[in-house]
């Protein structure tokens, strides 16, 4: 039970009879100030300069009922369900706020968004500002290093040098509490040795909650940020093939997989609305209408494939190609985000400019939603990639009149909401699945599935296959319990190209993930594809069958996420109170009973695996293991996967039938 206890000298937050957080008269743990933050955006990457003009520590003077009375203003505490809401009052005139929480050396911190390079954030400084995860400069330097033989797959920049598609002012402590802010402006978390310093660039309420276990803590958090609903039944029935290039190519590649007894539940054709070939690769024409020239008879093929149990998925984002008809309509109606001069604000993504639909304009919001209903859903698509959401410039002029600095972070959640409403208003929730890249608070209750963005097709720690595991785990810690990645990565250009080694290892990992979906990549012609030869066709087909065999198990885990907010991909420390479990970001639990340790090095045939204190059965050999660290054989097709001996599910039997 959560309680607030007050006397003349202190206010304490108590959980199950134990004091967890104590505020004393005279403490200076709050501060307010005035300042401004300047943002410069280049292709979704932000240079941020902070200017603090005033900062005033606020001493606690006294307590009145559940209120913390400060030198200026007060903080009102309200217990709402199992969480405590801290609501600042009387702090008008300030636009920055600081709050300090006590910490200790052994405490771990997790979350703050989708984090690709770290798992435990102790000692780090996290900036909460939605952006592109990988920028042009980083990729260019990497390609040059590869060219001159300086490839270093273990290289990582300082933590603060990385940005992320999904940011959220939320963290989970290993001491079984969470902090979550209602702020929409930038936040900064400093996880120091003896304290955690929280800065928000606005005066905003926040939440703290405690629980006996991490599952209950996630339920408390997702009571605030929301949860994803259960997935359509067809999603579990194998692999969604990533194909592009037209109707004939789509069917040819699909039939190859069928001939190898692959389990195909969908075909994702991102170029259904048209292809734009640029200097960086094969991209898309952002005009959300069927390209009949590239995909003749697609409407008929969709119906034929649906009869075979195969769905067809497309692509959509909140931009508009300025050369195409939908933009002409939008700009004529005043539906685009404006710049300070009143012109449509055109942003450059890679090599071309695009306009943005102003989602704060109710008419524009309904216009793009109706396009999704008519051109995607009514056309017959069973899902789509709902891309982007990170690019709203802070000097934009919005229809609502709101300051874009306070809307920038929430833009991807608003974009997810458009897509979610289109699905629900069409009566298709439970039949259609869209998946999003960018996110913020609000995304967990709007999206149907996350994906981990434009990863590099290699084993690099910061951008390649290894980065996927901490990314999925950190999303789970924010309440987004459904996520997956492009099989083989995406950003292929020049000497960044997908080879057979990384492709097979990515197939293995995604077979043991919530969703199995492929992607041809930015430059398909330089990448290995699933139909390159009979060997990879058979390998990919086998992995799809293994994934399909997980259907009952995954459905149960997804249902738990929908009901309780406990993600499908879970960190080991959820159930094992061991030091290594709190720091291991490169293994994960799929549901409660399966431990997965993807192979993360090129040409590796073994992998060192940490097993928490339990009884485990190695999937491929059925050999039993106790807790400990082992070097496990990992030939292609057999990444280290272990099933709990005392699993309540029959998942081991289901998998053994397939392997």
Ranges and model annotations:
Residues 303, 450-467, 554:
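Catalytic nucleotidyl-transfer cores of nucleotide-processing enzymes
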């Amino acid at each position: 039970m959560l309680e607030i206890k007050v006397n003349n000298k202190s206010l304490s937050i108590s959980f199950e009879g134990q004091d967890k957080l104590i505020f004393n008269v005279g403490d200076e743990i709050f501060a307010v100030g005035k300042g401004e933050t300047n943002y410069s955006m280049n292709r979704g990457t932000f240079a941020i300069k902070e200017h603090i003009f005033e900062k005033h520590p606020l001493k606690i003077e006294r307590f009145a009922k559940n209120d913390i009375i400060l030198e200026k203003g007060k903080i009102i505490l309200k217990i709402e369900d199992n969480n405590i809401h801290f609501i600042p009052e009387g702090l008008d005139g300030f636009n920055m706020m600081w709050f300090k929480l006590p910490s200790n050396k052994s405490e771990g911190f997790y979350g703050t968004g989708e984090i690709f390079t770290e798992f435990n954030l102790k000692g780090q400084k996290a900036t909460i500002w939605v952006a592109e995860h990988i920028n042009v400069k980083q990729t260019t330097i990497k390609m040059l290093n590869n060219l001159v033989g300086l490839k270093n797959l273990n290289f990582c920049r300082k933590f603060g040098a990385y940005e992320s598609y999904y940011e959220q002012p939320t963290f989970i402590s290993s001491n079984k509490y969470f902090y979550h802010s209602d702020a929409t402006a930038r936040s900064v978390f400093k996880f120091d040795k003896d304290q955690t310093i929280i800065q928000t660039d606005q005066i905003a309420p926040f939440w703290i909650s405690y629980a006996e276990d991490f599952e209950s803590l996630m339920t408390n958090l997702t009571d605030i940020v929301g949860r994803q609903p259960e997935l359509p039944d067809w999603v579990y029935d194998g692999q969604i093939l990533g194909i592009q290039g037209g109707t004939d190519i789509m069917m040819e590649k699909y039939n190859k997989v069928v001939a190898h007894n692959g389990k195909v539940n969908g075909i994702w054709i991102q170029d259904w609305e048209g292809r734009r070939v640029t200097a960086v690769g094969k991209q898309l024409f952002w005009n959300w209408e069927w390209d009949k020239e590239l995909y003749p008879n697609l409407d008929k093929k969709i119906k034929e494939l649906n009869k075979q149990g195969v769905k067809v998925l497309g692509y959509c984002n909140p931009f508009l190609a300025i050369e195409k008809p939908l933009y002409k309509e939008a700009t004529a109606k005043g539906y685009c985000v404006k710049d300070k001069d009143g012109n449509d604000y055109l942003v450059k993504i890679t090599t071309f400019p695009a306009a943005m639909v102003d989602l704060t304009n109710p008419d524009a919001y309904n216009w793009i939603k109706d396009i999704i209903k008519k051109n995607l859903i009514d056309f017959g698509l069973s899902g789509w990639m709902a891309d982007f959401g990170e690019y709203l410039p802070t000097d934009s002029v919005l229809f609502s009149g709101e300051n874009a600095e306070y809307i920038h972070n929430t833009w991807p959640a608003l974009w997810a909401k458009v897509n979610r409403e289109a699905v629900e208003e069409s009566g298709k929730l439970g039949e259609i699945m869209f998946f999003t890249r960018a996110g913020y608070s609000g995304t967990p209750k709007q999206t149907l599935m996350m994906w981990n963005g434009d990863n590099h097709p290699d084993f690099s720690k910061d951008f390649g296959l290894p980065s996927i595991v901490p990314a999925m785990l950190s999303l789970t810690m924010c309440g987004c319990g459904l996520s997956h990645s492009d099989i083989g990565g995406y950003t292929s250009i020049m000497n960044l190209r997908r080879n057979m080694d990384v492709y097979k290892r990515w197939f293995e990992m995604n077979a043991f993930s919530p969703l199995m979906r492929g992607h041809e990549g930015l430059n398909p012609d330089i990448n290995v594809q699933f139909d390159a030869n009979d060997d990879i066709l058979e390998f990919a087909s086998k992995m799809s069958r293994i994934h399909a065999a997980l259907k009952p198990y995954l459905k149960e885990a997804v249902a738990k996420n929908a009901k309780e907010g406990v993600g499908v991909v879970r960190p080991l420390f959820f159930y094992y109170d061991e030091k290594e479990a709190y720091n291991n970001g490169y293994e994960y639990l799929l549901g409660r009973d399966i431990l997965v340790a993807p192979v993360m090095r090129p040409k590796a045939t073994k992998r060192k695996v940490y097993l928490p204190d339990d009884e485990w059965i190695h999937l491929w050999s059925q050999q039993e293991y106790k807790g400990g660290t082992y070097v496990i054989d990992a030939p292609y097709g057999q990444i280290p996967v272990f099933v709990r001996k005392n699993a309540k599910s029959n998942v081991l039997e289901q998998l053994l039938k397939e392997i």
